[in-house]
């Protein structure tokens, strides 16, 4: 009987692994096609819609955690606010050169109005105005700001001589961050025994963390070797990509840990129940912390060309 249970456990683990590989491979293929066509008008609007939708779903999932914890009543309201914030952000970042100057302020104006409106929208809420406004604001910013910064990384080189440089940087950011996730998952599953934070994220192991760091370093080294010749002038110190990739892998790990803390506080295993994925936050969590690091790096090192 014991052997039978072990067999079922292993079979279930392999089935889950197979589903993860299939789902993430399909998502990755779609993402690559979308990224590398993101400078064309039609596909750029598709990307804008998809990123705004992802942000809205992520915000809804975070708000649902708050609902489970403290009966937060505005999950859908916050998700709509996140969608509008990111849709306006996309328009101002991608098409700002052809829009009136005041358009850059619209996303932030909407955010302020949305938070104030949330206070008056639920007058009899059991959690109070301070908590209500705080959860509404944070639920939008937690997901919305990193996605907005990702759009900056992708499109801020569009008016330079090398508009595809933004796509290169976006690819580097995703590859190193999610590569660390993948290396950490597989090696942690195969060889990991010692847990890093068993009370927060039981599946995170020391072996997985080290493997993730090595994976991010390896991927950044590959990018370093394959820098296109036409981009060379933008990389006065190209070797800095290697420690940057490591930093993105490490911050991505802590982004994952932060989301796990939120889930444990709400007594949830996954942020949602998408097959083989968990939820939008479970997919984006590592990028939510690594994206601001990549943005700051570009803002400092590419200040002449990068329109942050």
Swiss-Prot record:
It is a multi-pass membrane protein. The keyword Transferase applies. It is found in: Cell membrane. Pathway: Phospholipid metabolism; CDP-diacylglycerol biosynthesis; CDP-diacylglycerol from sn-glycerol 3-phosphate: step 3/3. Its EC number is 2.7.7.41. GO terms for biological process: CDP-diacylglycerol biosynthetic process. One of its GO terms (cellular component) is plasma membrane. The chain crosses the membrane at residues 30-50, 73-93, 100-120, 127-147, 167-187, 205-225, 235-255, 280-300. This is Phosphatidate cytidylyltransferase.
